Amino acid sequence: MSACRGFLLRRINDSCLTFRRHKFKKKWATTLPKIPCSRLALQYFDINYSMQFGDLWPSIRISLLTEQKYGALVNNFSHKETVLNNLSALKAKDFISEAQSVISLLQTQNNVDTSEKMVFTEVPLNLVGEKNDAEQTQATNLLSSLSNSKLTCFTFSRGDISRFPQSRSDCFGLLEYYLMDAASLLPVLALDIQHGHSVLDLCAAPGGKTLALLQTENCQYLAANDLSTSRSSRLHRVLHSYVPRDQRAEHKVRITSWDGRLWGDLEASTYDRVLVDVPCTTDRHSLLEEENNIFHRIRTKQRQMLPLLQTELLVSGLRAVRPGGEVVYSTCSLSQLQNECVVQRAIELAATDHGVLVKPQDLSCFREVFKNTFNFFQDCRVGELVVPHLTANFGPMFFCKLLRIK
C-alpha cells in the first residue's frame, strides 16, 4: 500500500504541462476591449470638428456633453390660455413672442409703414443688409411671416437650467405641450407656411416638427412620411396625443412609410412647401446614448453612406415641390459634410439630372431675431447653424432654405 502511495506521489511531482491545439482560435474582435459607441463618436468629433470650428470647439464640446435644454411647444388645440399661464408661472418665456417683439421694435425704429410693402432700409441691426430687390422682398416677407406666427414655445432664460414638468392631459385627453429642442422649430419657421399650403414632411418621425407644422394652422394638407414603420408608429402616437381627430382626418393628414428618395417620381411638382429633416449622425445623441448609436461598429457603412442618402432625399424633396415653392433642409449635426456640402451637391444634381433649378435663400435675419435664445455659427456658406452653448444649450441644428425656380 505504501509503495502504491509513493508511486502516485512521484507521478504528481513529475507532472508536466502538455499543450493542446483547439479547433478554433479566439478572434481578435471578441478579445480586444470594446470601446463604447459614445467614445468613438467623441473621438470622431474631436478630429473633425476641432478643424471645422477651431477655438470654438472646446465650448461646443462641453455643451454637447452637458444636459440639453428643452422648449415647451404649446398645443394650440388644447386649453391654450391655461397652459400659457402655467408656463409663465415657471418664469419661462415664449421665445417666438420675444422675436416678434424684436421685429416690431425694428419696424418702429425705422419708421416702417406696415400698410405698405415693407422695405427695411438702414436697419442698424442688419436684418436685411445689402441685398437686391428680390432678396430684400424675401427677407421682408419672412420677417412678416414670423411676426404673424401662431407657434408658441416657452424656454427658460439663458443660464437657467430649470426643467419643464411632464405635460398633462386636458379634459379632452390632449396633452398641453410637447417638450423638444427649441432649435427644432427654426426649420418650421423658416418654411414660411401660408394659409392653404400643401406641405410634405419627407422624414417626419418621431413627430416634433410634424406637430409644429400642424400647430401653424396653415396646412390645408400635410403628407408626413418616414421609411421606418416603427418610427411612423411613434409619429401616429404623437399626433393622437396632441391633435383632435377632425384635424388629422385623411383629407388633411396622410402618414406613409415610403422610401423618401422616390418621392420625386411619385409626386413630382406637387407641394407648396417641403421639409427635408434627414437622418444624420445626431451628434448629441451619439455622445450621450449607447442605444441605437450610429457610431456602433456594425453601422460603420451606414454612417459613411449618410451624405449620399441625405443628398438623394434633398433632391427628391426639390423635385416634389412645385416651381415657386420652397424646401427647407435640416439636420441635428454640426458636420459641414452633412450640411453645406449636401446642399451644394443636391443643387448641382437637381439641375443636371432633373432640370430643377433652385436658389438658396438668405436666412441671416434669424441670427439677429433669435440671438437672445440661440447661439448661431457665423461662418456658414449656406444656411444657418445653431451651436450648443452652456448658457443656451440648444442644438445643434442646421437649416437651409431653397427656392425652386424651375
From Swiss-Prot:
Superkingdom of the organism of origin: Eukaryota
Location(s), subcellular: Mitochondrion
EC number(s) stated in the UniProt entry for this protein: 2.1.1.-
Keywords from the named record: Methyltransferase, Mitochondrion, RNA-binding, rRNA processing, S-adenosyl-L-methionine, Transferase, Transit peptide
This protein's record includes keyword rRNA processing: yes
GO CC term, one of those recorded: mitochondrial large ribosomal subunit
Family indicated by similarity: Belongs to the class I-like SAM-binding methyltransferase superfamily. RsmB/NOP family.
Role summary: Mitochondrial RNA cytosine C(5)-methyltransferase that methylates cytosine to 5-methylcytosine (m5C) in various RNAs, such as rRNAs, mRNAs and some long non-coding RNAs (lncRNAs). Involved in mitochondrial ribosome small subunit (SSU) maturation by catalyzing methylation of mitochondrial 12S rRNA.
Protein name, UniProt field: 5-cytosine rRNA methyltransferase NSUN4
Native source organism of the sequence: Xenopus laevis
Gene: nsun4
